[in-house]
A protein has these predicted regions:
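Extracellular beta-strand-rich solenoid/capping regions of secreted or surface-exposed proteins
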Residues: 86-93, 104-118, 127-144, 150-164, ...
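Right-handed parallel beta-helix
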Residues: 116, 121-122, 139-150, 164-179, ...
């Protein structure tokens, strides 16, 4: 006669496996998530474009950039003015910035990027030269698929992140030949990812900076 074995699952079916933890919720921008009729604005026209946000990794993986903002198209390679990258980056509202032109933008001063911006260079070859990008006390910025090279002047970096900036993602960018450094992250800035980017180091004051 067979043995009887007692156990927690002998008289009833085993409990279902535990549910996986919910993914972290992206923090909303100050203006809210901008929904109309239960759907996110622009969802039907640029869903694949904005899917970039879901591929972020590392400490900056919660960066949402301009996810909940309008699509803004750069149509000019001028340093400033209508249709320029600088005009888009200084806007107060969240924006997902794309390019309708390829070429070189000669920056005569640092290009300051405000919070909740995505600079998305995919599909074009966009080169920034002369100066670099400055992220000062800003939050939720994504920079993707840009070339930054040939920055000249004292304290000129390809990308400066300071002070107290958070949730920044720099992805698939090429940086080379800046008089100071390529990417400078300082002064309590945190939650930042630099991924899949090419950095060509150049000497500065007997040291190398990346």
């Amino acid at each position: 006669m067979g043995s009887r074995v007692s156990g927690p699952y002998m008289d009833s079916p085993p409990p279902p496996p535990p549910r996986p933890p919910s993914p972290p919720r992206h923090p909303p921008h100050p203006q809210g998530e901008r929904h109309v009729g239960g759907e996110m604005l622009y969802q039907d026209t640029d869903h694949r474009l904005r899917a970039l946000v879901g591929s972020a990794e590392g400490f900056g993986r919660h960066a949402i950039g301009g996810l909940y903002g309008a699509i803004h198209r750069v149509t000019s390679l001028q340093d400033d003015g209508p249709g320029s990258l600088r005009e888009a980056c200084r806007a107060e509202e969240p924006l997902w910035i794309v390019f309708e032109v390829s070429g070189t933008i000669h920056l005569h001063s640092y290009l300051r990027v405000s919070s909740y911006k995505t600079i998305d260079g995919r599909g074009q070859r966009v080169v920034l030269t002369g100066k670099g990008l400055r992220l000062k006390s800003c939050h939720h910025v994504i920079i993707c698929n840009l070339v930054l090279e040939g920055g000249r002047g004292h304290d000129v970096d390809g990308i400066q992140v300071k002070p107290d900036s958070t949730n920044i993602w720099i992805d698939r960018c090429t940086l080379a030949d800046y008089d100071d450094g390529l990417i400078d992250i300082t002064r309590q800035s945190t939650d930042i990812t630099v991924s899949r980017s090419f950095h060509s180091s150049f000497p500065c004051k007997s040291y190398y900076y990346i």
